[in-house]
């Protein structure tokens, strides 16, 4: 997601994190804070299209799940303290929401890769999301025109799709996202 995560020197606590200015975007991995760069236009355009599709589906089903775009905090661990801001997440357990953040793993996460630091989405976040209980994780890479889907429930499966594909959202029975429509709309 972020092109240049810059680690800060000291470990931070939840209290220190909450004291940061609201306009400062930071993620914390194992107590180390990383500043996040601003996303690009294509990043935000993809985010908007996906959030719109996901939210429309959930509303049409009158479901309990909620869609949240970044910045919205997810505290995935207290020990070690880890808090992330996925580009898009879906939370189906309202008890995880406290008005300020999601406490625990969302059901579904999408990260949109920015060119400066793709390893963060492909490696570090995939590791954290798998280990802390995310059910499904998509990595949307506009530069490579690829979507990597990690299904962390049941038999672990990772599948790569092109932007020409229609992809099933497995946490729902009948939701499919046609990436060729998104690519055409955004001219990517």
Residue ranges and their predicted role:
Residues 1-188:
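Gly/Pro/Ser/Thr-rich low-complexity, intrinsically disordered segments predominantly at protein N-termini
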């Amino acid at each position: 997601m972020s092109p240049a995560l810059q680690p800060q020197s000291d470990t931070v606590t939840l209290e220190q994190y909450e004291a940061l200015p609201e306009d400062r975007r930071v993620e914390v991995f194992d107590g180390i804070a990383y500043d996040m760069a601003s996303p690009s236009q294509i990043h935000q355009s993809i985010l908007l299209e996906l959030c719109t599709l996901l939210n429309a589906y959930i509303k049409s089903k009158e479901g309990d799940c909620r869609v949240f775009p970044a910045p919205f905090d997810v505290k995935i661990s207290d020990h070690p303290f880890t808090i992330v801001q996925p580009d898009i997440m879906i939370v189906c357990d309202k008890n995880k929401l406290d008005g300020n953040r999601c406490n625990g793993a969302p059901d579904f996460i999408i990260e949109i890769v920015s060119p400066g630091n793709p390893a963060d989405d492909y490696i570090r976040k995939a590791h954290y999301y798998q280990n802390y209980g995310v059910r499904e994780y998509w990595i949307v890479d506009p530069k490579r025109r690829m979507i990597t889907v990690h299904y962390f429930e049941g038999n672990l499966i990772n599948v790569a799709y092109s932007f020409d594909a229609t992809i099933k959202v497995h946490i729902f029975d009948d939701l499919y996202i046609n990436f060729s429509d998104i690519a055409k709309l955004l001219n990517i």
